Regions:
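Core alpha/beta nucleotide-donor-binding catalytic domains of modification enzymes
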Residues: 1-139
Length: 139
């Protein structure tokens, strides 16, 4: 089966739907934000959540954290996420390190994690019930 085979996507959606229902991850009407970096794993998560939103009975949005650690590359990731969310019609909240009271992402992984958690807390306080994250097998 090729990665772009539509049956692969349907199979993946079916597995995710079954897992979400079995685990009781979402309640009717909940607002779910996909945490998206712009990478393949998180963008796939966003697309799958959008495809399943009706069956899961959830409202889907996205959030993105710009850690500002990689200069122009971080800004390019943010621009990509903004563009994709606009194209898909997905509400997006962007958190940027050192802005709007958010911490800087210094201090390596611990600092980056602290920034992500601060962003997720802000998103949750804004009315989002669940934040979904995606990781590849090698993460």
């Amino acid at each position: 089966m090729r990665p772009d085979d539509p049956s692969l996507l349907r199979d993946t959606e079916a597995r995710v739907l079954a897992w979400c229902e079995q685990a009781g991850l979402f309640a009717h009407g909940q607002r779910v934000a996909a945490a998206v970096s712009g990478g393949a794993d998180s963008m796939a998560l966003l697309r799958i959540l959008l495809a399943l939103a009706g069956r899961l009975e959830v409202e889907v949005s996205a959030c993105h954290v710009n850690h500002k650690l990689r200069g122009a590359a971080a800004d390019a990731d943010e621009a990509f996420v903004r563009g994709e969310c606009a194209r898909l019609g997905v509400p997006l909240q962007v958190c940027r390190a050192g802005e709007d009271g958010l911490p800087l992402a210094g201090g390596g992984e611990a600092g980056a994690r602290a920034l992500r958690y601060a962003c997720f807390e802000r998103v949750h306080a804004g009315g989002i019930d669940r934040i979904a994250t995606a990781h590849t097998v090698t993460d």
